[in-house]
Regions:
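Structured interaction patches on ligand/partner-binding surfaces of diverse proteins
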Residues: 61, 88-104
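Short, acidic Ser/Thr/Gly-rich low-complexity loop/linker segments typical of extracellular
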Residues: 57-68
């Protein structure tokens, strides 16, 4: 049967984004501690009040008067993000092995103000950018799902919009964190946004940024509703997929993967008899890290335990109604790695289409979310 697996929703992620799972973490999840010190790269002096957090989690703190920080993290991999006003953002990949090393020294480089001024001067900043592009940004950054509709951007004034007619591109920058209240999932999200770029000609988005989650306070009824909604958001997400690959439980968790072959402009699904062999799955017993690379660059992802949202079916009238269909494009010949918590890399090298592209920030859960 011929099936067109292409969908018009496409998004490229450069950070640990939409990573959820049906892989159940144990209540006795083990932790490790990452310690370090934040200093000025030029002077070597400690920086007090630097924001240090594990990206896409609820775990973070500010450095103390000596520039020191200490984070306890559930087993797995993370991207550690360090920000400080007037300095360039620093990121580093960490896992349990990092905690076995000496205290990290994080050197932050002061921003080059002259270069920043010149860059802004020659760009095409849109006057009243929020009034003109705010709705578009919200739909493509927060999303259009039912949970996205319950998100509120608290400080849109920090956003600056730049449109390039020559490149047919809209870029959004922010010097301060963008604050978003997600009343559907019970989180306040603080986004350190490097840039959000929409390419109109390819209908694709590129987001470079670092979210931190803060749990909202609510009464028992609110907490119960948030828990219910988080469980819904958890199903069929990218981390559910990655953790299912990691634990070799794709079928049990409701996923089916197929390779997609294009022949004369038509996409044909190829059923995989030896799924993990086709992914070249390999577990490193010493690091507990899984590496894989699909034999085919385009992989269709079918999730059977939840139907697509009504609004998605209205936006894409060709979509199937009884399962969620996405595809992921992997670069040929590149190996990917998955940590025990579903963190995978390099994430900047994949493109998600279809239902996974439809789900955006409004459906995000933090890495340290554990299903009940």
């Amino acid at each position: 049967m011929k099936t067109n697996f292409k969908r018009f929703f496409k998004v490229i992620f450069l950070f640990s984004f939409f990573l959820f799972s049906s892989f159940l973490l144990s209540a006795q999840t083990s932790y490790y501690v990452v310690k370090g010190k934040v200093i000025d790269k030029k002077t070597g002096k400690p920086l007090q009040g630097a924001s240090v957090f594990a990206q896409n989690t609820t775990i973070g703190e500010a450095s103390d008067s000596a520039g020191n920080f200490s984070l306890g993290l559930p087993d797995g991999g993370y991207s550690l993000v360090i920000t400080f006003t007037g300095y360039e953002t620093e990121t580093m990949r960490i896992n349990r092995a990092t905690s076995q090393n000496d205290s990290l020294i994080v050197e932050l480089k002061p921003e080059e103000q002259e270069l920043a001024t010149v860059t802004i001067a020659i760009s095409n900043e849109v006057k009243d950018g929020w009034a003109k592009y705010g709705s578009f940004f919200r739909d493509n950054f927060i999303g259009q799902s039912k949970f996205s509709k319950l998100c509120v951007i608290k400080n849109p004034e920090v956003l600056h919009f730049y449109f390039s007619k020559k490149r047919d591109r809209l870029k959004v920058l922010a010097k301060e964190p963008l604050i978003v209240d997600n009343f559907a999932l019970g989180y306040t999200l603080k986004f350190a946004i490097d840039s959000f770029t929409n390419y109109y000609n390819t209908k694709s988005n590129l987001f470079i940024g670092y979210p931190l989650f803060v749990k909202m306070q609510g009464d028992s009824a609110q907490q119960e509703k948030w828990a219910e909604n988080r469980a819904i958001a958890y199903k069929g997400s990218l981390l559910q997929l990655m953790r299912s690959i990691y634990s070799r439980t794709l079928k049990e968790d409701g996923f089916e993967l197929q390779f997609v072959i294009n022949n004369n402009g038509e996409d044909f699904p190829i059923h995989l008899e030896n799924l993990y062999g086709a992914l070249n799955y390999k577990m490193d017993d010493s690091t507990k890290t899984v590496e894989f690379y699909p034999n085919q660059s385009e992989v269709a992802v079918i999730y059977k335990k939840a139907d697509p949202e009504k609004i998605y079916l209205e936006m894409d009238t060709t979509a199937k109604k009884n399962f969620q269909l996405s595809d992921i494009i992997f670069p040929k010949g590149e190996t990917f790695f998955i940590e025990p918590n579903g963190f995978f890399y390099d994430q900047e090298d994949i493109i998600t289409n279809g239902y996974l592209g439809f789900k955006k920030m409004g459906d995000m859960l933090p890495y340290d979310y554990e299903p009940e």
